[in-house]
Amino acid sequence: MTFELRAAFSPCGDQPEAIAKLTQGVRNRTPSQVLLGTTGSGKTFTIANVVANVNRPTLVLAHNKTLAAQLYQEFKEFFPNNAVEYFISYYDYYQPEAYIARNDTYIEKSLLINSEIDKLRLSATRSILERRDTLIVSSVSCIYGIGSPENYTSMALELTVGTEYPRALLASQLVKMHYQASSVPQRSTFRERGSVIDIFPAYESELAIRLEFFNDTLTSIDYSDPLTMMPKESVTSVILYPGSHYVTPEAVREQAIRSIREELEERLAFFQDRPIEQDRLFHRTTHDIEMIKETGFCKGIENYSRHFTNTPPGAPPTCLLDYFPEDFLLVIDESHQTLPQIRAMYRGDFSRKQSLVEYGFRLPSAYDNRPLTYEEARKYFHNVIYVSATPGETELNESQGHIVEQILRPTGIPDPIPEIRPATGQVDDLLEEIRKRLSKSQEKILVISITKKLAEDIAAFLSELDIAAAYLHSGIETAERTRILSDLRLGNIDVLIGVNLLREGLDLPEVSLVAILDADKEGFLRSTSSLIQFCGRAARNVDGKVIFYADHKTLSIEQTLKETERRRHIQLEYNKANNITPKPIIKAIFANPIPQGGKKAVQDTPQKPLSTQELEKLIKKYENLMLQAANAFRFDEAAQYRDKMKAAKEQLLYLS
């Protein structure tokens, strides 16, 4: 299949030129290109056009899952008939294993896996192995810690009508593929009923596979509704992929066990004069070996990944990139933040594991379950497009002049020129500006503070004045962060104060004011790149305004003003030449998509916007009601609960 782009609009402004240049660069095998596009210029739409033109499997990397979710939603709309997949961390909660030597504290790995995201991850790898019209959106931190594609594909099971499959052996094979026998129809399970085997793939929630046999001969294969098991499509063959990325063939598992034991013997000899560490390592590793031998899995199995891939110490680990073919297209979004994250991940992982290995909690091979170094990652950059409004030196140097600018916005809105006001009395002045805008409906204000404490104090001050304000910084727990962002999108918050709001992907057309406090305090979040990015947050509103509160102009402020004026001049000249009047973006705030009405309302659904916690409870409630209805053979009712659960999950995915 080929990528089929669907959009209600056509490329305009400088988008056609950018699309043509980037497409030609990919076709000419240019290793690196930069799309330097202003905020709101339609960079995602441009990339979608390039993907459709070159028709290659594509990986889009974002630096956090908030941005990844936004990109996933957009590409899903552009390519409704293609395999657009989402690959992020499947942990709702994750505490990595660690040992603090100074106070002899061992912290065991603790985690909570999100089943829905696990399904999406498995769906992503299935698609890239089967289809070339696959686009995967991923956060950069989660492409690691995944089993090898060779082991994964070797455990896939191809079933063909007319072939004999001894039923007992087939059931045994399904268990080895991490499917469980169960009478309840849910993901990663199978059930036997007479001459029928129903399989519920780990990567599907809308389809089940029904196999019908005569003795041991497979007579039919149907894709069926997982609740009613009514057939949707009959096929002559199907490939069933494993229920986990960590499955391994038995021969590989046996070889890995031998290799682990050899390393254990070497390490026990190393700890000869340290009996505590020696005993600890022996018992922990021996227990893991027994678990792998009996079940094919153990807690922390990723720490033995080198033994399963049979690679030498220090070799690059397998990752999501290995699942892609050689000619894939790599798009690195917000590259000025994503590339530094790739560089930093290896160092952070190594320092955490150092004490675990040194004190006998892990074998040295645990070091090889790690992120790629930047040099290792670059070997995958055969065809890469860096996307950023402010690309860094790395991207500019690696692109060797292949830089495509996209300055014009489809809306015709020019870059706002920052207004500089004194930092003295900045909070009082800010309050006056906020009150002006709150008299207009649906306008929002972003405030950038220099410290977490100042963000909290300003939020408290505004709240006392009955202004709907909230603060957001790195000290906020993930669940609370999600709630705040959803409240902002749903209109429950008018003013958001933060230290680094760039990472949140807040591109809201309702934002009419961006105020940067203490803009003259030169540093990371007051650099030219950051200031330009902050200004872009107001460039989606016709009346967008940016205020720098500064007592003097720093070099970063001067460079920001110069670049903003350059872009604004180009934008205004184009508007004048083409008789364009700036117009606002039509972009509705995300609403509750849970369906109402229909054939028969099985349960009243709350009309008010739901928080993350409320959605999670609602999903669990619908799941229980769905299973109860299915077990009672009330399949129409169960299907309605399934649809409601799916809609709630989609909203939760968007908000997270």
UniProtKB/Swiss-Prot annotation:
SUPFAM superfamilies: C-terminal UvrC-binding domain of UvrB, P-loop containing nucleoside triphosphate hydrolases. ATP binds at G37, T38, T39, G40, S41, G42, K43, T44. The keyword DNA damage applies. Residues 426-589 form the Helicase C-terminal domain. Keywords: ATP-binding, Cytoplasm, DNA damage, DNA excision, DNA repair, Excision nuclease, Nucleotide-binding, SOS response. The keyword Cytoplasm applies. Belongs to the UvrB family. This is UvrABC system protein B. It comes from Chlamydia abortus (strain DSM 27085 / S26/3) (Chlamydophila abortus).
